[in-house]
């Protein structure tokens, strides 16, 4: 039911029209594995053959083929985070990267439709930066433990407790939280963001470990929140030291969402893109990536001769995004990502300040 504003001179709010109604629904294609599909996807299989056995490719290829055709038909672009599985990352994604890269690239997209292969806050960020575009996420239940650790109301209480202290919010948060924020950050630019502020004290939320790690690199006083990434908080310094002892010469590369004790053991720490660039530049013989499991597979497909040693931890939220769900998203124009207009402008400003920050 459309609610009318009966105040003098007020026009009724326009009725919402779903993406499915705007673009129409397309009938599901035949997903049989044919010789033609095998030929047309052969160059893509070359990228993932070390992770997907040939007999299993018959189940993947029809989806890959259908998605890549539908992208053109829909004038859509697929943005995929570095934690997506190799079949998505290498076979259907148009743009890949960490949260900062995806946020920046989202502002340069010409396509009418963005399909975000990642978790919900990433899709929200793309919508904030592209309010006129249609943004879809294949599974709206793809959440994030960090995003769920804090609300906009929590930030307002923090601002009351620490009046005048600027708030730097990790991009792994909802639009509601971003709207209460001075500027956003990612794991790749958090230090630059903190240093860009004139205040000697900064609220860096909600990732406690990220804040603790940046506090070691700045003279500013860092206040934080007790949010944690469920993937990275499970790693311990003791297990990494044990791996180092058992594997002499191995290089350990960690994500700054890990506890500072873990980062102390690492030979390098950085965002997911920072990790990728480190491996490409240094070409270490053996590497232990202290992050989500798909990272090693995605790097290994591009960098030959590097032996990636476990352990790793799976992100159950990232793994909710699959080829069948991406196909359904493009066929049915679901699930559309919307941001409450009451908070969108303020949330967008915090993200744009981050994107436009010169580093």
Swiss-Prot record:
Keywords: 4Fe-4S, Cytoplasm, Iron, Iron-sulfur, Metal-binding, Pyridine nucleotide biosynthesis, Transferase. This is Quinolinate synthase. Its EC number is 2.5.1.72. It is found in: Cytoplasm. It comes from Sinorhizobium fredii (strain NBRC 101917 / NGR234). Pfam families: NadA. Belongs to the quinolinate synthase family. Type 2 subfamily. It catalyses: iminosuccinate + dihydroxyacetone phosphate = quinolinate + phosphate + 2 H2O + H(+). Its cofactor is [4Fe-4S] cluster. GO terms for cellular component: cytosol. The lineage of its organism: Bacteria, Pseudomonadati, Pseudomonadota, Alphaproteobacteria, Hyphomicrobiales. Binds 1 [4Fe-4S] cluster per subunit. InterPro entries: NadA (IPR003473), NadA_sf (IPR036094), Quinolinate_synth_type2 (IPR023066). Iminosuccinate binds at residues 81, 99, 170-172, 187, 255-257, 272. The gene is nadA.
